[in-house]
């Protein structure tokens, strides 16, 4: 009788905890996003290598670091938690005590003040997992940061994954099946060996997600095995796991304000006591031949060649981008696009057309560092309430030979269980598999 009462009490507690969690989740999105204007330069990735993919090994010793700047300067009480999600980035329904070892919420305790910078800010950072918050299950996770522990105003959300490696993945880049995509797209085939798993029905219990350059916005989700061969699941769809190759990313180098990069044609302090810079004009690459060079695949790093440490000694530079065109795009707007925009088309990163110089112009506050980016277009008549879809066809072009990173995530949900595990993960570079 005592065991029955305990089981009922535990189930009731988990139900109530889950209901409270779902109610709180209605105020934010389960994707990478910053919800307030005064937080800038949100970085999240492996500690010491924050530009890399945010992945943890279950039971491993590594950690992820989240860092950001608050330009309102005063010290604030930021609180964070993590939410376990299913393969589709919906709440898994697990209560926090089922996947957290320690406290469900914790304050961000590490902060420092900027110095030697015209733009004042407070720099915050945290590492996860830590001694107060451990992780006990693999899967998709959402890191949520609140401002004010009582009101729980969500200010930052970031996706990350925890992997419990139980299978091996083999992948290769192949020529696209569709003739019209041979010179512009990239296709990836892969197979997994699930010998170590007690899989009853691989078609239902195993699925995969494929990402390009850490982008969740254009990922290919819910891939079931196409064929089975003994203990292997083969994901060879011949035309389904295909991505536009794009072009190598453009760059902005603001690492030094004393000895500016050659593409910085002007740099000075303006009348508002802000550091500002102007970049050399750029143009469309849609019809240009492919040019190969080393890039960061859309990511950025904060680095300062003049002062250290870069996290608090770097200034914000109001950077002007000038995109020359023969004619304005009648049905599209132009946007800065990349990791710096959280891979979203955002109003605050729109370039405006200036007929006097036949160019789109944008001015954006960027912390000193090294940035990769694209210019993307999006329909001007798009529904303002719906996520805008970026296109690179008019601005950047697309080539099959472009160097890109691909990430394969393998999910496993045994029959009768309550959550999706991640049991396999691999990063593939196009240059390494040709």
Residue locations for each model-derived region?
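Extended low-complexity, serine/threonine- and proline-enriched intrinsically disordered segments
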Residues: 74-102, 200-223, 331-342
């Amino acid at each position: 009788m005592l065991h029955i009462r305990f089981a009922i009490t535990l189930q009731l507690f988990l139900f109530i905890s889950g209901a409270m969690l779902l109610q709180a989740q209605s105020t934010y999105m389960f994707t990478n996003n910053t919800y307030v204007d005064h937080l800038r330069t949100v970085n999240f990735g492996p500690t010491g290598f924050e530009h890399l993919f945010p992945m943890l090994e279950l039971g491993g010793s590594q950690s992820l670091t989240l860092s950001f700047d608050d330009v309102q300067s005063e010290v604030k009480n930021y609180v964070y938690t993590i939410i376990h999600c299913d393969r589709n980035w919906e709440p898994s329904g697990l209560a926090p005590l089922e996947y957290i070892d320690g406290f469900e919420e914790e304050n961000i305790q590490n902060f420092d003040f900027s110095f030697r910078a015209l733009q004042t800010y407070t720099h915050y950072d945290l590492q996860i997992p830590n001694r107060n918050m451990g992780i006990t299950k693999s899967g998709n996770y959402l890191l949520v940061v609140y401002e004010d522990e009582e009101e729980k105003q969500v200010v930052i959300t970031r996706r990350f994954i925890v992997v419990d490696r139980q299978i091996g993945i083999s992948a290769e880049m192949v020529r696209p099946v569709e003739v019209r995509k041979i010179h512009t797209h990239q296709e990836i085939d892969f197979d997994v060996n699930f010998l170590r798993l007690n899989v009853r029905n691989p078609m239902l219990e195993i699925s995969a997600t494929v990402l390009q350059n850490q982008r969740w916005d254009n990922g290919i989700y819910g891939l079931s095995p196409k064929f089975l061969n003994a203990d292997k699941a083969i994901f060879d769809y011949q035309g389904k796991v295909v991505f536009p190759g794009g072009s190598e990313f453009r760059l902005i180098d603001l690492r030094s304000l004393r000895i500016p990069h050659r593409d910085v044609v002007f740099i000075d302090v303006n009348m508002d006591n802000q550091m500002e810079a102007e970049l050399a004009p750029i143009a469309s690459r849609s019809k240009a031949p492919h040019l190969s060079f080393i890039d960061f695949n859309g990511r950025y790093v904060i680095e300062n060649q003049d002062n250290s440490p870069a996290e608090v000694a770097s200034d914000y530079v109001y950077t002007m981008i000038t995109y020359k065109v023969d004619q304005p795009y009648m049905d599209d707007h132009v946007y800065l696009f990349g990791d710096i925009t959280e891979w979203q088309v955002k109003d605050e990163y729109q370039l405006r057309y200036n007929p006097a110089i036949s160019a789109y112009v944008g001015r954006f506050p960027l912390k000193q560092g090294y940035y990769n980016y694209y210019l993307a277009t999006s329909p001007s008549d798009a529904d303002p309430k719906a996520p805008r879809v970026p296109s690179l066809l008019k601005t950047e072009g697309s080539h099959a030979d472009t160097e890109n990173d691909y990430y394969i995530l393998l999910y496993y949900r045994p029959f009768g269980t309550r959550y999706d595990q991640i049991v396999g993960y691999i990063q593939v570079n196009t240059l390494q598999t040709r």
